[in-house]
């Protein structure tokens, strides 16, 4: 639950960060924020005075006689109040155009067209400090090198058509870029086609990212509690639909650039213009320096010094020249296959497969899903031989009822390579027809228990009738302990440890409490009755040390016997069937001894083992579930792993995991195929385009 909440929180934060990034990026791209500047631009709010001047200028221009002769296709509109004024530093480029017989200038900062009022044009220089305001159409300049439009408001009425179409630069040092020389006639302006747009924009990164985000949200929903499932699934579906919509119906109309269509004479200028015909960067049209695609270089010279039809972007990048050279036709006939989104899909598929593998066992999800698809009836079994003879398969459902023994195969500890025994782990049921195993018995443990009881009785007496009451009270007040059956302790120690090398520390301690020099002599005196009635006084510290020594000595014997019983119980007879819960759930309900809140002593562990063995070595059971695995071990025992039947919601999670896994695998293979195929097509694309142009320009006359 905690992991699920953490994953959900991470995704929510990621979505918030992505949304904020897109929002601020869009703001940066809106209006004048995207205008390039040679120095760091500054920003301020549009004042009321500036807003009024812009409104007066645009209103006067739109209602005056200029609108009849001047193209208003890219004329600015009234900006919104509170718009930002950007102060930047850059070079202004201009070229001439004609519309309905009227010449006019169009101004650009790099590839961005701007509107400069004619009254501010005389103040332009080689590098200019401009105050630019964004409008719904194109930006308008309200200040040039310290001269502002509001200072020229009184001259609005003096504007003439000649000033508008051919502004005079009164400043002799003004050096804006302009297209002089052979005339270039602007025929019309159009929007770029979808094919031209795809060449430099349609990478599919955002579309693929939205689809991957939807799939990852679906993966997250399968790891979340039920309460979050519908909401996260709905969010993931929304991103998927949006991504698919953008792939098949991209919203590109508002993002298309303008294409300027010219007719004019191409010239080769510059340092290499007279002798180096391999240069494609020194060709111009009416003073406009042109930028060509590199693979057009062998074919451009056919149109030099000829009147040619040409289409280009505002940044002077040519996209069509003459009857043959055309990026539109190239993309239409030999499309460039982009595979960025396919790479994103591959990474997303690998991530989903990895998360499914780490978070939920994939084999279990698939087995339970196949079991649900088969919709088989449970196999009712009352005898283990039916399981041995039946043709069972993974995914089948069984219901077993009978009498067996709680048993789980022992695990192997990597630390000490010793079998770890958990008494009667009822997550496994051993089922056969052999006689039930006997309850564990041990005479050694009974002897150890007798010694423990005797020492406990003397060091912590409840009532002692063998000692004078007044003497007992005096001993207690003095902080001493009385051993009034010292010979009994000696005899029971000898009975537990008959060998000379056993219980050496305990034997030495008892010898030190007597007047005898060695253990055999002490035992002989106790057996002869010479120590009968002998009382031994011990200080509290000595009594505590003796008690701990007896506990330690007897514990080693008890644990040894428990290990022997574990080996016996871990060695059931061969054959039969072992039903195991792969969820480690208890298949039999039984009452465990939970009276003590402390760790049980070795003797208590032995008593609990005896109590449970009497119950669970031969216990009735009724269990069932979906078979998730079957194996026959070295003893010939058929081990069947069962998973309890999930409820409808859990089954839905398992089915969702399986379907998402198969989808991710198929998605991975499909996109790997697309990546390889598209790379091969792109490698052959330029060769096919070159063959096409060779055929167009150099085909033999018919």
Curated annotation (Swiss-Prot):
The keyword Transmembrane applies. Signal peptide: none annotated. The chain crosses the membrane at residues 4-24, 204-224, 227-247, 343-363, 656-676. Keywords: Cell inner membrane, Cell membrane, Membrane, Transmembrane, Transmembrane helix. It comes from the Bacteria. One of its GO terms (cellular component) is plasma membrane. It is a multi-pass membrane protein. The keyword Membrane applies. Pfam families: IgaA (PF07095). It is found in: Cell inner membrane. Up-regulator of flagellar flhDC master operon. This is Flagellar operon control protein UmoB. The gene is umoB.
């Amino acid at each position: 639950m905690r992991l699920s909440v953490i994953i959900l929180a991470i995704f929510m934060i990621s979505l918030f960060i992505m949304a904020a990034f897109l929002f601020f990026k869009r703001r940066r791209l809106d209006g004048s924020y995207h205008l390039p500047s040679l120095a760091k631009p500054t920003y301020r709010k549009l004042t009321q005075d500036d807003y009024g001047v812009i409104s007066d200028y645009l209103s006067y221009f739109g209602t005056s006689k200029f609108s009849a002769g001047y193209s208003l296709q890219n004329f600015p509109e009234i900006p919104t109040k509170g718009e930002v004024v950007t102060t930047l530093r850059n070079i202004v480029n201009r070229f001439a155009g004609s519309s309905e017989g009227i010449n006019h200038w169009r101004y650009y900062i790099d590839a961005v067209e701007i509107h400069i009022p004619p009254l501010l044009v005389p103040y332009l220089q080689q590098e200019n400090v401009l105050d630019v305001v964004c409008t719904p159409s194109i930006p308008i300049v309200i200040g040039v090198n310290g001269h502002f439009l509001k200072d020229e408001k009184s001259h609005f009425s003096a504007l003439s058509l000649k000033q508008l179409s051919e502004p005079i630069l009164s400043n002799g040092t003004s050096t804006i870029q302009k297209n002089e020389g052979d005339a270039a006639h602007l025929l019309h302006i159009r929007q770029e086609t979808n094919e031209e747009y795809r060449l430099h924009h349609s990478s599919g990164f955002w579309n693929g990212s939205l689809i991957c985000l939807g799939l990852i949200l679906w993966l997250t929903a399968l790891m979340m509690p039920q309460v979050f499932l519908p909401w996260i699934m709905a969010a993931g579906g929304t991103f998927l639909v949006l991504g698919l919509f953008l792939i098949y119906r991209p919203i590109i109309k508002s993002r298309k650039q303008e294409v300027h269509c010219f007719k004019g004479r191409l010239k080769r200028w510059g340092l290499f213009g007279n002798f180096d015909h391999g240069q494609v960067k020194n060709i111009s049209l009416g003073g406009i320096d042109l930028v060509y695609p590199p693979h057009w270089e062998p074919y451009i010279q056919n149109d030099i010094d000829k009147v040619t039809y040409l289409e280009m972007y505002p940044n002077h990048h040519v996209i069509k020249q003459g009857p043959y050279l055309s990026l539109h036709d190239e993309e239409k006939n030999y499309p460039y296959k982009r595979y960025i989104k396919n790479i994103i899909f591959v990474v997303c598929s690998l991530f989903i497969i990895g998360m499914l593998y780490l978070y939920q066992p994939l084999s279990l999800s698939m087995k339970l899903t196949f079991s649900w698809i088969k919709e088989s009836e449970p196999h009712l079994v009352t005898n283990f031989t039916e399981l041995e003879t039946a043709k069972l398969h993974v995914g089948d459902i069984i219901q077993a009822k009978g009498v067996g023994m709680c048993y789980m195969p022992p695990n192997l500890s990597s630390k000490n390579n010793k079998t770890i025994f958990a008494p009667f782990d009822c997550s496994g049921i051993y089922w056969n027809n052999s006689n039930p195993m006997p309850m564990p018995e041990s005479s050694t443990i009974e002897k150890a228990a007798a010694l423990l009881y005797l020492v406990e009785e003397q060091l912590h007496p409840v009532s002692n009738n063998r000692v004078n009451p007044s003497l007992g009270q005096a001993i207690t007040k003095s902080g001493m302990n009385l051993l009034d059956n010292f010979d009994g302790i000696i005899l029971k120690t000898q009975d537990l440890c008959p060998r000379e090398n056993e219980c050496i520390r305990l034997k030495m301690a008892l010898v030190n409490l007597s007047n005898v020099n060695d253990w055999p002599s002490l035992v002989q005196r106790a057996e002869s009755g010479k120590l009968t009635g002998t009382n031994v006084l011990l200080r509290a510290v000595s009594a505590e040390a003796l008690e701990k020594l007896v506990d330690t000595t007897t514990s080693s014997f008890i644990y040894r016997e428990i290990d022997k019983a574990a080996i016996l119980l871990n060695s059931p007879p061969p054959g039969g069937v072992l039903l195991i819960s792969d969820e480690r759930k208890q298949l039999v309900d039984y009452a465990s001894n939970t009276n003590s809140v402390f760790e049980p002593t070795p003797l208590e562990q032995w008593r609990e083992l005896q109590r449970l063995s009497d119950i669970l070595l031969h216990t009735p059971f009724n269990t069932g579930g979906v078979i998730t695995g079957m194996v026959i071990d070295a003893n010939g025992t058929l081990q069947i792993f069962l998973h309890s039947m999930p409820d409808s919601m859990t089954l839905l999670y398992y089915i969702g995991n399986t379907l998402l896994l198969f989808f991710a695998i198929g998605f991975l293979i499909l996109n790997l195929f697309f990546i390889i195929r598209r790379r091969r097509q792109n490698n052959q694309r330029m060769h096919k385009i070159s063959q096409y142009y060779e055929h167009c320009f150099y085909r033999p006359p018919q």
